[in-house]
Amino acid sequence: MIKVIGVRFRKTGKIYYFDPVGNDIETGQHVIVETARGVEYGHVVLGVREVEDDKVIQPLKPVIRVATPEDDQIDAENRDKEKKALAICNEKIKKHGLDMKLIDAEYTFDNNKVLFYFTADGRIDFRELVKDLASVFKVRIELRQIGVRDETKVLGGIGICGRPLCCHSYLSEFIPVSIKMAKEQNLSLNPVKISGVCGRLMCCLKNEEETYEYLNSRLPEVGDFVNTTDGCRGEVSSVNVLRQLVKVKIEVGDEKEIREYKVDELKFKPKRRRERFNVNDEELKALEALERQEGKSKFDD
């Protein structure tokens, strides 16, 4: 086991581990640390704790110091400079006629580098733009092309549920989502209905996946034959996954009757689950395209 603290450098960004070097650092404090990008000002989201060695990427870098009021002031000034940098970079993009959309600007704490994040449909030759920006800011310039998921994470928005987007509110990292999750939850497989603001499969499909997998594993399939505790045998006509109720079609004399049972009142042989949805080729291709476009955040490189 090794003692670490967890630090973020962006809101809802990835959490990185650092060595507290014996300091009693608490959640909510700010620290100065050295990263691959240089000296950075970070927000402590996980106080001192022990984690397993295999959870830590070695060598574990130490905390340089707990942030001072002067450090806080420098960070606040950097935030102001980032707004001005965005405006200047947008002007330069227009000047060079580049087909790219600027999303965010970021100063490193030591002011040795300015990073600009942008989206574009293809590759962009921005070499002349970098030279132009370097002559203005007199520091190292880095332009980084990001995807639509990163763009949405930065800008935020409201989902179809009426709540702030998960990626902008609390998700530290993008989680893999798949068509299978939508099927498991009995959702419409219309790409429009299960896509987020970014145009990719909604992150929230992952939230209830395990619950639905467990609940579905306890139920028979529609069309299966089951035995009931009251001595009847019938065909499953429908299931209610969340309430764990099953409607069974039972023959009573010359008539057929639909009765509802709790899943615990039925006996059946579990078998490999079948695909429960019929999707046309066009919709399936669209869904598979969305699934292929899932990727890791470019902010974490």
Functional labels for PLM-detected ranges:
Residues 14-16, 40-42, 232-234, 256-261:
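Short beta-strand segments
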Residues 33, 227-229:
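A generic structural signal for residues embedded in beta-strands
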